[in-house]
């Protein structure tokens, strides 16, 4: 039985509720190569990808996000790691969703700035917790990125966004250890109604990545957990999607 979550609209795709589970992939062309990103995005769309994630290391790289968005008819997610100004720039060009780890982009004022930019354009935020980059105080408490640690990190960031009256949220808690990842999603799904983005991080080689991602993502979906999933284990995102 699928665990129904609240609906979140990502461009022209709605996840959560009884909506179909949306399949994502991620471009792997250097962000400076705008033409290469656009060409790869078109191939992914033709292969049936429903949501496309593009990395954006800096504010200047938002021009790649804009070019890709203008070239395809599927939602574009900006993957932000450390520079909150990159998130602001992506919101300005009308990206469909922003992925951040709030703990990596600075103090609360920077998080608030991103939230306000997303509120103005109704852009959802995915809180992307990664077992390899948990907060120091959480690692000190648990000693390792165990499921309880990842869930605590996710809920901490959810509360931070909610503090700024923002609830247009999707959550992911990825780990390269598949059993840990699966247990973390079970625990998280039991305590939140935000839609869940399911994936395995640092999955390894193509063959190993397919195996680990198939076990982790497939296992969660069989348990009724997950509203969108992402696979990016291959040199070709199209190959990953078709797998």
Residue ranges and their predicted role:
Residues 47-67, 102-105, 172:
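Glycine-rich, proline-tolerant flexible connector loops at the mouths of alpha/beta enzymes
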Residues 139-234:
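Catalytic alpha/beta core domains of metabolic enzymes, predominantly
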Residues 61-78, 114-122, 188-193:
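Alpha-helix-loop-beta-strand connector modules within alpha/beta enzyme cores
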Residues 232-243:
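Single conserved hydrophobic/aromatic residue that forms the stacking wall/gate
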Residues 21-27, 52-54, 76-78, 98-100, ...:
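Hydrophobic faces of well-ordered beta-strands that scaffold small-molecule active sites
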Residues 106-164:
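Conserved anion-binding
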């Amino acid at each position: 039985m699928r665990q129904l979550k609240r609906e979140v609209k990502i461009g022209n795709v709605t996840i959560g509720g009884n909506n179909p589970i949306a399949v994502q992939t991620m471009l792997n062309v250097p962000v400076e190569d705008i033409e290469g990103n656009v060409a790869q995005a078109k191939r992914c769309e033709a292969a049936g990808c429903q949501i496309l994630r593009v990395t954006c290391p800096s504010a200047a790289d938002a021009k790649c996000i804009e070019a890709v968005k203008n070239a395809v008819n599927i939602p574009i997610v900006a993957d932000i790691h450390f520079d909150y100004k990159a998130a602001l720039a992506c919101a300005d060009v009308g990206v469909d969703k922003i992925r951040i780890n709030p703990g990596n982009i600075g103090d609360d004022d920077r998080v608030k700035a991103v939230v306000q930019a997303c509120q103005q354009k109704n852009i959802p935020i995915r809180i992307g917790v990664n077992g390899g980059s948990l907060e120091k105080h959480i690692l000190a408490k648990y000693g390792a990125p165990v499921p309880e640690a990842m869930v605590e990190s996710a809920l901490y960031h959810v509360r931070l966004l909610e503090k700024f009256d923002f609830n247009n949220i999707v959550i992911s808690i990825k780990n390269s250890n598949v059993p840990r990842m699966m247990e973390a999603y079970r625990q998280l799904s039991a305590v939140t109604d935000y839609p869940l983005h399911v994936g395995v991080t640092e999955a390894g080689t193509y063959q190993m990545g397919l195996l680990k991602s198939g076990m982790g993502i497939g296992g969660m979906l069989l348990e009724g957990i997950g509203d969108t999933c992402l696979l990016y284990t291959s040199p070709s995102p199209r190959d990953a999607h078709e797998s």
